[in-house]
Amino acid sequence: MNKIIKSILSIPFALVVLLTSSCLKPEPCNSKFQFEQESITLKRGEQVTLKFSGYISKKTQISWSVEKPNVASVDNGLVRALNAGTTNVYAEATINGIKKTALCTITVAPEGFRFTDPNLPKRILQLHPEIDTNKDGAITPEEALLLTELDLEIKDKAKATAEEKITSVEGIELFTNLTYLNLKNQFIKDATPVEALKKLEKLYITYTEIPSIQVKEMPELRDLRLFGNKNIKEIDVRSNTKLDTLYIQDTQISEIDVTNNKELIALNVNRTNLTRLILADLPKLNQVLAVKCQISSVSFKGLPAIKKIYIDNNQLTRVNLKDLPALMHLSVYNNKLQTLELDLPKLMFLHTHENELKSIDLSKLPMLFHLDIDKNPLVKIDLSSNKIIRDLRSEYIPTLEEINLRNGEYNEDAQYEIKEGNTGLKRVLVDSGDEETHLRNLFPAGSGVAILAE
């Protein structure tokens, strides 16, 4: 029995000895023969020493070779970049009796090309793995030309992940076939490399820290959005004759010239430092947003297609609104307007509250549907020519004595906010019937306001 037990106990011991002896060789059993980096991008003249990811004995004999010696050279692991292009560097060795080969793809970039932020090429390949034609995990100059659209927008800047964040776009200049580039909410401070992308049709660089951007070498540019860049003080779009959309709100831009932009459809300059706005002979311009600037002077001429003008919260004392046959929305509230001449056949929505208007002629607005005219020193509001008026806001006007709603029509969905703060109101002229009932409910007997119906 004792002999049997001794035999059994000796088996594990023998296995340990066997396993230990099998690994007593120059290299560990699990040794991997590969480089730490599978691909490296260098500029001409730079050099790098290739390192192996696993343990390699100093006694191991390694032979080195390079596929294209005109692109890079290799000497005992030291790689030197010679000329632009892509090549493979090989290391060969026999380990534990097995011949092994390690490979590293070396890209020598053209002069001026370098990805300062490694997140940029990494993110591009995550979004567009199809351009990595040689499957080496790097972007060659030739592969960069395959990309025509690149969207690097961060949806929520406060929740941006590390891999989404890009601090430098150096290297983007290699992507010369790009027609669309979106860098919204990115963490860049310099957009200079983008200026080399001459085929861009759409460029969105918004809510970044860039101080400037030049787009005059982008003749195909149609849609430019630079809003939210608090450090930008100027932009020149005179050379961008195909431009149809320009959004530069929330910048420090104080002057903009769109004289040459005959294709312009939409312009947004909200919350800029503009002091004047001149828009002339722009046949396709459809809407203008110029809210909360410092504008004291505007000129609108030759704008046959414009439908919306918003110039609220500025310093305007007068505005010329002649020859705007398509205008439907006009908002000029919170300015210093004392007069307002209105001959706009298609105007439906008019916001003029918080100005200094003592009188207003609404008789040439046959399509007027909504009027907001609070807080103006008016004495009378006459809507007798405005047959489709439905919404009226005319409150907090202590000087107001009369409102004339008698126009032969009444909308059963009418909303008349005409009571609060109108301490001097004496009479309201209405059409008899439903409108009369509406107003008598609003101003019951004893209110001091006479409801005169016909």
Where are these regions (language model features)?
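Canonical leucine-rich repeat
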Residues: 169-172, 191-194, 210-213, 234-235, ...
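Extracytoplasmic soluble-region selector
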Residues: 24-110
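LRR flanking "cap" motifs
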Residues: 113-177
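Concave beta-strand-loop units of leucine-rich repeat
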Residues: 149-165, 177-189, 199-210, 220, ...
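C-terminal motif of bacterial Sec signal peptides marking the signal peptidase cleavage site
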Residues: 19-22
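Bacterial N-terminal signal peptides that target proteins for export
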Residues: 2-12
